[in-house]
């Protein structure tokens, strides 16, 4: 009944868009009759209408119709009705759930164009540089055709290039580049260094990956700290003589370690110290990380060793995360465990979670194939509603019920048997595994079965072949083993992907220098095509641009030639000719193979373990049955799998025992399916609570961050920072006077105050505050403030003689330097507070409430410190003038 109500609620939403879609369709002929120039002028017409007070919603039907027509003319692609619905959802600041292959990239152009008309800029966020560049060069042509500017942010861009890209109407950028640019903008020393404009509207592709999977991982800008490397080596050795359930307990659900009293005493005795928790010489942090590295972080599952370094493997995608490091000393603990060089621990200069970063946008939306299972979290944290968009063609994928085995060995045998059956039937098979270790185990098993297969995991030798392997995973009898990395990015096309194979042939010919005669892929093509390719290659030999290209530049030229982007240079034109010749022949070859594969049942997806989130499982299933193709999926499980063992294995094991199921017989029942779903919901709820807790704690820091960044911006924008300095001075004087006047001895009051003010003003020994002023503290403060102003005026006049405007530069420098230094130290203190606050729960205190209270006190201390330090630095600084 609930599902019925739920479905009808979503359907009512979809039905509510019908009138708008109908209106857009009614304009199609009228807009189609416009010339290119008339279509182009529509953009300026829409902008004028908005200036008159017309709303975006009012012009939406005509604007969407204009974009649809531009897409037909520029790319030869017509936007379907369901894609229009998806675009309306994005414009409304919601999440559009659209299945694999439904054309999400094109959907973003409609909402992006409409919102860019306001002149505030639109950010379209992708998960990697390649997708950002591809989308900007491909669908970005639609925006350019209609007169909008298109920007692209890539990792290697300079500040000036970034600034220009962010000033464009539509900017394509990755989530990490966008976040880091925000943090860097709040560390600059002049307004001219800021690259981003004010945030307005953001469309996030693969929104669940960024807002949920990445939610627990903050963006951090850091620098070297002074943490001693020896402590990691010592605690690694110590962890090896500590025993589980004796010296420490492991909480697998929370992925956390708890030292027992016996363990604490043992460690203190072994290290010859009195207190593990001593703030002046803390050891507990290092010990807990060493035990985490030993118990919870497994080689070839959570990380790999490459070039004598620990490289993180993303638990959601299976991809290696080069350049990323675990924070808070955990990475160093794993380096000590693996006996590779231990790199210096870093200190955080600036940080923000994706949760709080994307909430900075007044209007936020996103697209993904899998979000409905997480709609509660997306709504509660981001205020984002999820709406499922119908597929353009009916979904034909068969989803078989799970098979559960009593032990893992029998499960893997059954998976190998299934692969063999599919291989014999001519059906392509994609097997999703959860780790490098499991993927290699299955690969060995399939080798024993003599089943040809491709292996794709985080190992460097396999990562390089990722696109090729996935692009051809839909071919007849192909078997592909992949970690979760296969879930996104490249479509699996039944029969094979002619676009990818054509591109790979060009790379073989031009970069790897494999001749036409020795290229096995080319040998499958007609002699006429081989001859034409040879002629094109010969013509390139005389091209000076081609001759001077580096490998990376040539690879980029090939990518451009292989995509549907406008080109004009001879080199790119010749490369595209070669690409199209190869593509057309392979398209004919693969179309025949596609018919056979479709008749055999299409792509079969095998899941080897349930993930902690149903959403990740759905991503794997979604590889089959794209765009109305046939396909199927099935999960093979064992009660020894991590998810079932930790979150529900006993109940399921008892059920199997009650039904007297032997080791070789899989269990398949409605009751079992419900138990599996309950286990998965339990783990989803657990991790949601974890992310919610991260969010709640980071909200405390976020409010402080916004206050500091607002103060920084006020100083940067100020042409007269003197006012800020004098405000700080008044506050400092208040603090000094209030502190000194609380002294019990009158004589002591006078001496203390006189000494402190004399020091503040950098005055001579003759400086003296009249005792008559002490009777009225407000008059006393006014008098001291006036002395500070006089002192400041004299200092300003002196510096103006040396160099006009020098005092203003010094003011900004001192203000920003002290704020940045204090914020950096504050982040370290907040991190230490966050680590320690959990213990308060043992004293019947709410850790979050305690954290808020102590964080507030730390923040007030920091603000006070900044004000005092700036005022003392300005009033006591001595400028050395160098004579030429």
From Swiss-Prot:
One of its GO terms (molecular function) is ATP binding. The keyword Plastid applies. It is found in: Plastid, Chloroplast stroma; Plastid, Chloroplast thylakoid membrane. It is a peripheral membrane protein. PROSITE patterns: SECA, SECA_MOTOR_DEAD. Its main location: plastid. The keyword Ribonucleoprotein does not apply. Keywords: ATP-binding, Chloroplast, Membrane, Nucleotide-binding, Plastid, Protein transport, Thylakoid, Translocase, Translocation, Transport. GO terms for biological process: intracellular protein transmembrane transport; protein import; protein targeting. It catalyses: ATP + H2O + cellular proteinSide 1 = ADP + phosphate + cellular proteinSide 2. Pfam families: P-loop_SecA, SecA_DEAD, SecA_PP_bind, SecA_SW. Its EC number is 7.4.2.8. One of its GO terms (cellular component) is cytosol. Belongs to the SecA family. NCBIfam families: PRK12904.1 (NF009538), secA (TIGR00963). This is Protein translocase subunit SecA. It comes from Porphyra purpurea.
């Amino acid at each position: 009944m609930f599902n019925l109500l739920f479905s009808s609620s979503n359907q009512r939403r979809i039905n509510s868009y019908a009138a708008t879609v109908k209106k857009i369709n009614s304009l199609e002929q009228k807009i189609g009759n416009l010339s290119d120039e008339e279509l182009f002028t529509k953009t300026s017409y829409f902008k004028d209408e908005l200036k008159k007070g017309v709303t975006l919603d009012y012009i939406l039907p005509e604007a969407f119709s204009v974009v649809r027509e531009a897409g037909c003319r520029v790319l030869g692609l017509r936007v379907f009705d369901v894609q229009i619905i998806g675009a309306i959802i994005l414009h409304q600041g919601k999440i559009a759930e659209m299945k694999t292959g439904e054309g999400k990239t094109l959907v973003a152009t409609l909402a992006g164009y409409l919102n860019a008309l306001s002149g505030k800029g639109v950010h379209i966020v992708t998960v990697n540089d390649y997708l950002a560049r591809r989308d900007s060069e491909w669908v970005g042509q639609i925006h350019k055709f209609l007169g909008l500017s298109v920007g692209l942010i890539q990792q290697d861009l300079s500040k000036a290039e970034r600034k220009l890209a962010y000033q464009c109407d539509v900017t394509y950028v990755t989530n990490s580049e966008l976040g880091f640019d925000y943090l860097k903008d709040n560390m600059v020393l002049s307004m001219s260094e800021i690259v981003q404009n004010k945030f307005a509207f953001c469309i996030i592709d693969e929104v669940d990956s960024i807002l949920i999977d990445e939610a627990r991982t903050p963006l951090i800008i850091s620098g070297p700290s002074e943490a001693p490397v020896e402590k990691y080596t010592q605690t690694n050795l110590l962890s090896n003589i500590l025993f589980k359930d004796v010296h420490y307990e492991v909480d697998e659900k929370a992925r956390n370690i708890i030292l027992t009293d016996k363990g604490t005493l043992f460690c203190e005795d072994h290290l010859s110290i009195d207190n593990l928790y001593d703030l002046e010489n803390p050891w507990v942090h290092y010990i807990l990380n060493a035990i985490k590295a030993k118990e919870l972080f497994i080689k070839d599952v959570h990380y790999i060793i490459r070039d004598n370094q620990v490289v993180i493997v993303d638990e959601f995608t299976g991809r290696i995360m080069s350049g990323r490091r675990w924070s808070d000393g955990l990475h160093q603990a794993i380096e000590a465990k693996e006996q590779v060089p231990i790199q210096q621990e870093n200190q955080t200069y600036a940080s923000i979670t994706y949760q709080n970063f994307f909430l900075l946008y007044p209007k936020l939306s996103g697209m993904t194939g899998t979000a409905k299972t997480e709609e509660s979290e997306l709504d509660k944290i981001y205020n984002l509603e999820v709406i499922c968009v119908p597929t353009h063609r009916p979904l034909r994928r068969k989803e078989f019920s799970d098979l559960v085995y009593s032990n893992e060995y029998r499960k893997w045998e059954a998976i190998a048997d299934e692969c063999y059956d599919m291989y014999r039937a001519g059906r392509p098979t994609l097997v999703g595994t959860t780790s490098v270790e499991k993927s290699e185990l299955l690969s060995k098993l399939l080798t024993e079965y003599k089943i040809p297969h491709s292996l794709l995991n985080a190992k460097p030798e396999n990562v390089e072949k990722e696109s090729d392997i996935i692009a051809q995973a839909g071919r007849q009898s192909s078997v592909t083993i992949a970690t979760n990395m296969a879930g996104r990015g490249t479509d699996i096309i039944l029969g094979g992907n002619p676009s990818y194979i054509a591109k790979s042939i060009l790379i073989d010919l031009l970069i790897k220098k494999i001749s036409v005669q020795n290229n096995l892929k080319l040998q499958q093509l007609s002699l006429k095509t081989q001859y034409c390719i040879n002629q094109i290659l010969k013509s390139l030999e005389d091209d000076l641009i081609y001759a001077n290209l580096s490998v990376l530049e040539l690879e980029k030229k090939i990518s451009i030639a292989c995509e549907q982007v406008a080109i004009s240079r001879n080199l790119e034109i010749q490369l595209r000719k070669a690409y199209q010749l190869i593509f057309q022949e392979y398209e004919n070859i693969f179309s025949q193979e596609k018919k056979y594969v479709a008749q055999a049942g299409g792509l079969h997806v095998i899941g080897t373990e349930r993930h902690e989130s149903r959403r990740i499982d759905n991503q794997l299933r979604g590889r089959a049955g794209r765009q109305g193709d046939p396909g199927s999926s099935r999960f093979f499980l064992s009660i020894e799998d991590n998810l079932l063992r930790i979150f529900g294995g006993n109940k399921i094991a008892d059920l199997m025992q009650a039904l007297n199921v032997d080791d070789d017989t899989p269990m398949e029942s409605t009751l079992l399916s419900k138990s599996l779903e309950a286990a998965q919901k339990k783990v989803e709820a657990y991790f949601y609570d974890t992310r919610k807790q991260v969010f709640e704690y980071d909200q405390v820091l976020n409010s402080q961050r916004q206050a500091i960044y607002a103060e920084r911006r006020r100083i940067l924008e100020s042409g007269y920072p003197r006012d800020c300095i004098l405000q700080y001075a008044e506050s400092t004087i208040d603090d000094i006077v209030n502190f000194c006047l609380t002294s019990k001895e009158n004589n002591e009051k006078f001496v203390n105050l006189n000494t402190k003010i004399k020091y503040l003003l950098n005055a001579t020994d003759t400086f003296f505050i009249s005792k008559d002023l002490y009777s009225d503290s407000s008059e006393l403060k006014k008098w001291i403030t006036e002395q500070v102003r006089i002192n400041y005026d004299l200092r300003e006049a002196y510096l103006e003689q040396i160099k006009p405007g020098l005092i203003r530069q010094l003011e900004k420098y001192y203000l920003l330097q002290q704020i940045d230094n204090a914020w950096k130290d504050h982040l370290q203190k907040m991190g230490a507070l966050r680590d320690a606050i959990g213990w308060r729960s043992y004293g019947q205190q709410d850790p979050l409430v305690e954290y808020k209270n102590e964080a507030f006190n730390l923040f007030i201390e920091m603000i006070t410190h900044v004000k005092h330090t700036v005022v003392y630095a300005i009033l006591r600084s001595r400028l050395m003038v160098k004579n030429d």
